[in-house]
Every structure is written in structure tokens, then in C-alpha cells.
């Protein structure tokens, strides 16, 4: 397993809503950072992600402590190392009482949702609004895309800021 396994490509994007910034966080497993055009890639066409990166805020230097799917995702969502959350080895669940970004953003009025690959648990540690797990499906599943559009439209209509994590599975080697 290489250091590229868990996280190598992601874009952090923000918009203004109700005076608070919206957050869209795109991540993919087993994908090199320079695959996406926003980070210099030439082989894959990613015009919409490139625009999000240009117009928003992105991380150009970010690191994970473990290059495995579940430990990394739980580290990202909790801000704590896998040794603290108990998520080693891969496919492990966090220890009870682990707090995630959902616990911190919800009291601030944010809706916090997860679209795509989840690979985290238990649910009380990561109580995302689930928009659909595409880990065994094609990412462009029409039902999931409709659910995501409804989520975004609802946030806009109610002027709720949101934090949306999009976890692709398609890039797995």
C-alpha cells in the first residue's frame, strides 16, 4: 500500500450563504493529486471541479497520518489521529464518544451531509445526513443526484449554510 491510498486528491470549496461559508469537500481514494486539472493534471477532464477550486478555497498542502480508507476518513471528519479514534486497522470503527465535524457545525446552524463513500462509524460519532452511498454504484446515479440537488435547493431556500462531503469510489485502482 502506498502513501497515495487514502487521500491524494481533494478540493476544498467555499461559498457565502447567510453570512456563513458553505463547504464542499471532494475526496477520492487511490487518485494522485495531479490527476485533476485544478492541480495540474492533463489526462482527466474535470472542468467543474477545476472551477470550484479556482473560485473557492483549496488545500494545496494537506497530509494524513495513515494511508488507508477508513482511518483516513475518520481522521478527516474528527480531526483526531486514528490512534486516538481507534480506527486501526482499516475497516475499524471509532471509539464511542468520538466527536466529528458534524457535532461542531450543527450547533452553528449548518446542515452536514455525506454523499458517496462513507466508510466510517459508528453512526453516533459521524451523524451525517446521508445523501446516498455510491460505493457499489456508478457515481452519477440519478436517484442520488436528485437527492443531492434537493439537499442543496433546501439549503438555499432556507438559507442554511451547509457542509457537503463528496466521497468518490470510482477512482479505485
Residue ranges and their predicted role:
Residues 1-2:
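N-terminal secretory signal peptides that target proteins for export/translocation
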Residues 5-14:
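Sec-dependent N-terminal signal peptides
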Residues 13-173:
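Formylglycine-dependent sulfatase
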Amino acid at each position: 500500500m502506498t502513501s497515495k491510498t487514502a487521500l491524494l486528491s481533494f478540493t476544498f470549496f467555499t461559498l457565502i450563504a447567510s453570512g456563513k461559508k458553505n463547504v464542499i469537500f471532494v475526496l477520492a481514494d487511490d487518485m494522485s493529486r495531479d490527476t485533476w486539472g485544478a492541480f495540474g493534471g492533463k489526462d482527466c477532464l474535470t472542468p467543474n471541479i477545476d472551477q470550484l477550486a479556482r473560485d473557492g478555497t483549496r488545500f494545496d498542502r494537506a497530509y494524513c497520518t495513515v494511508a488507508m480508507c477508513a482511518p483516513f476518513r475518520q481522521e478527516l471528519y474528527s480531526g483526531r489521529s486514528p490512534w486516538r479514534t481507534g480506527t486501526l486497522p482499516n475497516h475499524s470503527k471509532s471509539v464511542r464518544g468520538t466527536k466529528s465535524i458534524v457535532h461542531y457545525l450543527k450547533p452553528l446552524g449548518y446542515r452536514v451531509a455525506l454523499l458517496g463513500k462513507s466508510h466510517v462509524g459508528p453512526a453516533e460519532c459521524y451523524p451525517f445526513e446521508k445523501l446516498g452511498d455510491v460505493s457499489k454504484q456508478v457515481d452519477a446515479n440519478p436517484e442520488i443526484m436528485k437527492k443531492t440537488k434537493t439537499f442543496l435547493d433546501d439549503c438555499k431556500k432556507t438559507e442554511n449554510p451547509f457542509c457537503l462531503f463528496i466521497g468518490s469510489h470510482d477512482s479505485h485502482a
